[in-house]
Regions:
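DNA-binding recognition helix and immediately preceding turn/loop
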Residues: 2-56, 60-86
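…primarily DNA-binding HTH/wHTH and HhH modules…
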Residues: 87-106
Length: 106
């Protein structure tokens, strides 16, 4: 479980935003398949899904606490494009990020 906790900390710091699972696993001293198995065993998810969740949470915090534009938030949160940011955000919150910001402001 300690390896999964370390992996989660690295993911929250953006470890999978630029590199893949193999690079993260190497930093942890294990193989990528083993890392994925550990995530499934302890968290019932995958490292990529955990990274996506971390990016969405990071974006939500930025929406709530800054006046940054959505493009800046998408990139600062680790998304490769505004389109992927909008799609992921809408899937989780069932509304686009701009609607969340309007709701928070109103």
């Amino acid at each position: 479980r300690a390896t999964v906790d370390r992996a989660l900390r690295l993911i929250e710091q953006g470890a999978l935003d630029q590199a893949g699972i193999e690079a993260l696993a190497e930093r942890l001293g294990i193989g990528g398949r083993h890392l994925t198995r550990l995530f499934r065993r302890y968290l019932d998810t995958t490292p990529l899904a955990a990274a996506r969740t971390a990016r969405i949470q990071r974006a939500k915090r930025l929406i709530d606490s800054t006046d940054l534009g959505m493009t800046e938030i998408a990139l600062a949160s680790g998304f490769g494009s505004v389109r992927s940011f909008n799609a992921a955000f809408q899937q989780v919150y069932r509304r686009p990020p701009t609607a969340i910001r309007r709701r928070a402001a109103g």
